[in-house]
Amino acid sequence: MDIETANALTAFTARYCDAWHEMNGTWPQSEELYGVPSPCIITTMDDKILWQPQPFSLEQTVNAVERAMDIVVQPAVHAFYTTQFAGDMQARFANETMTLLQTWSENDFQRVQENLIGHLVTQKRLKLAPTLFIATLDSELDVIAVCNLNGEVIKETLGTRKRDVLAPSLADFLNQLEPVL
């Protein structure tokens, strides 16, 4: 496990939860995750849940992605998806506002790996360098991803070669993220 990335993700999650506590006096809330089972759920309300991050309970790898694609995934990506269970978190990096994707439960972890595989299959078909997404943007054509060749965090326009480097590593990227509520 990439400890630097795991620590950076844990620190950002703490900043996010602290900001939520300051603004609302509660743990983070979600309407989108209402009715979706997770070890993160503290309380279920009328149309939303309160959640807090929980330790990841499965093997801490995305080996299914590696096996399916016959590649070695950057250690930082393993750490990103297997450090914790948590809800997706809104964040800002420089001028980009995004939804930082997280694994909500054991079932969600399987779905995330399937989506990563689908993303990599499309890239392979288009002869693009492999990336693994970590966040979504308002534009459905752009994502924040980790380049699997060098570990850089990039803003990528899906299906194209358009990629802008945002940070030299996932840990650096996470350490610069600001919570958005």
From Swiss-Prot:
Pfam families: Syd. Keywords: Cell inner membrane, Cell membrane, Membrane. GO terms for cellular component: cytoplasmic side of plasma membrane. It is found in: Cell inner membrane. Its main location: membrane. CDD domains: Syd. It comes from the Bacteria. The keyword Cell membrane applies. It is a peripheral membrane protein. NCBIfam families: PRK04968.1. Belongs to the Syd family. Interacts with the SecY protein in vivo. May bind preferentially to an uncomplexed state of SecY, thus functioning either as a chelating agent for excess SecY in the cell or as a regulatory factor that negatively controls the translocase function. This is Protein Syd. It comes from Enterobacter sp. (strain 638). The lineage of its organism: Bacteria, Pseudomonadati, Pseudomonadota, Gammaproteobacteria, Enterobacterales.
